[in-house]
């Protein structure tokens, strides 16, 4: 639904569970264009939090989204989730003041999003922090992204929407990116 504000209070956690034999994440939706890129970039519904075609969405903190049960691998098994947040063809999205830990393949996969603000978000993960794909009017500011085994902030243009679309009008400012051990930035131990 559009016009949603998800507020994660101080000390609150949204925890991604491990799938079981009978329960799991939404299945990856069919996408005839998967041959143009890897599995993680071609599906949105197999995520802890996902939205398609939404407007006026805010997720804010200061709580934590903990992708404990998400995989960082290219799993195509039913019920396995591989992203913390996925947004496709959304407008007017604000993500601010919360933290993401162990996010699977991506902390955020934003594809075809117009008017996206990511402010003061902390990501401590083992793969990509923010993947900004086919988006326009994006502002990323005052964020911390620790991604020791992959990309911290990725800007790209792909066929994720089934057609090529540029990423345009992006501003990134006052961010800190690092490659410390997974989890050690949020717990302030800064280990390698």
What are these regions (language model features)?
Residues 1-192:
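Extracellular/periplasmic carbohydrate-active domains that bind, remodel
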């Amino acid at each position: 639904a559009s016009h949603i504000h998800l507020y994660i209070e101080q000390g609150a956690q949204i925890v991604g569970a491990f799938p079981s034999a009978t329960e799991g994440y939404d299945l990856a939706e069919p996408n005839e264009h998967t041959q143009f890129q890897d599995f993680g970039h071609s599906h949105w519904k197999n995520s802890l939090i996902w939205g398609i075609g939404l407007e006026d969405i805010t997720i804010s903190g200061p709580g934590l989204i903990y992708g404990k049960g998400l995989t960082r691998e290219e799993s195509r098994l039913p019920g396995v989730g591989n992203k913390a947040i996925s947004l496709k063809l959304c407008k007017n999205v604000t993500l601010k003041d919360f933290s993401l830990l162990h996010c699977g393949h991506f902390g955020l996969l934003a594809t075809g999003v117009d008017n996206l603000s990511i402010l003061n978000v902390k990501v401590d993960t083992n793969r990509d922090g923010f993947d900004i794909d086919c988006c326009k009017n994006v502002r990323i500011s005052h964020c911390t992204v620790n991604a020791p085994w992959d990309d911290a902030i990725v800007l790209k243009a792909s066929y994720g929407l089934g057609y090529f679309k540029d990423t345009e009008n992006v501003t990134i400012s006052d961010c800190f990116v690092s490659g410390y051990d997974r989890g050690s930035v949020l717990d302030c131990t800064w280990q390698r």
